[in-house]
Amino acid sequence: MKNYETVIGLEVHVELATKTKIFCACSTAFGGAPNTHTCPVCTGQPGSLPVLNKQVVEYAVAVGLATDCTITQYSKFDRKNYFYPDNPQNYQISQLYLPICRNGSVEIETANGKKNVRIHEIHMEEDAGKLVHDEWEDVSIVDYNRSGVPLIEIVSEPDMRSAEEVIAYLETLRQTIQYLGASDCKLNEGSMRADVNISVREVGAKKFGTRTEMKNLNSFKAIAHAIEGERERQIELLEMGRKVVQETRRWDDNKESSHAMRSKEDAQDYRYFPEPDLVPIVVSDEWIAQIKAKQPELRPQKLARYKKEYDIPEYDAKILTESKHMADIFEAATKLCGKPKKVSNWLMVETMRLLKDNDMDADEINFSPVNLAKLVDLVDAGTINSSVAKEVFEKIFSDDIDPEQYVEENSLKSMNDEGELKATIQAVIDANPQAVEDYHNGKKKAIGALVGQTMKATKGKANPAVVNKLLMELL
């Protein structure tokens, strides 16, 4: 069998965090009743005219600046003509000839080191509606709430060679866009979607192979599976002497396989022409400077600040800043309790464990930084011990409970009264003569068994340090 390399380029669609759509005043809120966020403009009614949302341009330019793109200072919209039920106008307003941003790059890091992935362009466009297929009724219905929601499409060059590089690129893009506040980039809600273009070729070959486009990829895990699956499918075809067909394929993550949707179109198939209802966009130097001045702290700057300001190790700072949401929780909780390393420990250890156990993403954390700060203070004051704190934190993670109220209602405060504890410890000593004898015979580990029995007798509420001290005294 020949040696093949995979060549991958991405088209990443990002829904922008504007309150209204790109060409009309309809709401972009996710989750509304079907066909309630619509008007004549976004449903393509005759005589309706689009008006460009200025915030869309500003977000697009901000993303372009953050990815080292050249900003196109004279930009235009174009019509992309095609018929599909979720496209009420029978064309999409997009950008082909003069996209808003060009020639950028994103630095990624994998186990193989650092690498630059080039960005061919970033263009603005409107989203289509959402088709829902009812397999029982054998019909399809359409919700136009999403029609006209503003998108940027970030088109990479075919610079990636593995699923690992693709995921690193997507994670870096998502972090950058989230930090800018341009989008929440939630794959499960469709506010970030990636179409993956894949081809294979023999190692050392200069010419690209025939590419296929993979769709229906709504998680990083699905993207990685689809890349590996399509790579194997194409290699198998070539090894059998057959040709790879240029087509769009739909990935089914449950079956871990794909099927052909349609032949892959080229630009000429869409008969693009300049959008007649919109004037060109002129982005002046002054406007670019204003957008740049409003740019918030991005991940690289935040990472450096955490190491310096909070004296946090680089590894911890990387984990804390991977998600803007987690970074926001860390900073807010630290501001409230003034204990950055202890807040960091709860996020790095218990939060990451619970996220993994529940197959959740850091962006799905829903507890308040106020409650995390309160928990840190409770432990620091000795009000609860570490084992009780873990129990309380699990309730914070799942239900965002007030830890002070929960500890009070469930009588979880630590037993720190030495007089009260001495009686319990003496009873434990009397009930475990063998452990006492072992301790007196030099087996120091025997005290651990006595501490454990005391903790059991106090239902975990005793302070282990106090228990240890009193045991030593009584023995």
Pin down the residues of each PLM region.
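Short, amphipathic C-terminal "tail helix"
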Residues: 444-475
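Basic, nucleic-acid-interacting segments
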Residues: 1-297, 314, 335-339
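Extended hydrophobic-aromatic, low-complexity segments
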Residues: 281-282, 317, 329-331, 342-343, ...
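Core structural elements
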Residues: 189-202, 270, 307-329, 340-358, ...
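Amphipathic alpha-helical segments in well-ordered regions
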Residues: 63, 230, 333, 346, ...
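Strongly charged, low-complexity linkers/loops
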Residues: 362-373, 377, 386-456
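Extended, non-catalytic structural segments that build the interaction scaffolds
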Residues: 287-294, 301, 331-338, 372-384
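Structural motif
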Residues: 2, 311, 334-343, 381-384, ...
